[in-house]
Amino acid sequence: LVNKHAKGTTMVPIVTQGSVENPRLVNSKEVDVGITNNNLSVLANKGVGPYKKIGAMELRALGSLHFSVLHMMTLDSSSISSVADLEGKRIAVGPAGGGTIPFLKQVLGLADLTIDDLTPSLLAYSDGFSQLADDNVDAAFALSGYPAGAVMQAKANKKLKFIAMTPEQVEIALGKYSNYNK
């Protein structure tokens, strides 16, 4: 659309390592525009999380694609019902370089857990939710628009349920992380 409607402007899509890398690419001027999600842009501008080594960036938003929702799902028959219940479990945490992992680290911290307390599998969302439906992982996560296509596909074959944060965890997250909202 840009190439067709914005005279003198050309855009060429390139494959990157994902929404975690894209702010770094824009900051280093390797690319002019990159796509990421709200929580990662907040972390990048503050220079925290995956951007701690680089430091604060001065990124600007051109627009919004959709709200990102962290889908934390397990089989309806699972004993997992809270973030704390994830300890020691096999979790599909999304693809390497994707936006789920930094967000997941924040959520786990609210239950005094780290990613080291899980057995993480770095899988594309569709593969992770397929593995959940096949009972090869205990839970699967996807940071995407709602509803996530991978969730809908798995839900067609298995009954799923959300893994909830406690009301206290939600209030702490809202106060601690500016990238959270109700």
What are these regions (language model features)?
Residues 17, 95, 141:
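Conserved residues at beta->alpha junctions
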Residues 49, 115-182:
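Pocket-lining segment of extracytoplasmic ligand-binding domains
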Residues 12-53, 126-131, 147-155:
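Pocket-flanking alpha-helical
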Residues 31, 38-41, 67, 75-78, ...:
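Solvent-exposed coil/turn segments that connect beta secondary-structure elements
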Residues 52-65:
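A structural signal for short loop-to-beta-strand junctions that line the ligand-binding cleft
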Residues 7-9, 30-32, 57-58, 88-89, ...:
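Loop/turn elements at helix/coil->beta-strand transitions in domains of secreted/extracellular proteins
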Residues 1-13, 64-134:
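Bilobed "Venus flytrap"/periplasmic-binding protein-like clamshell domains
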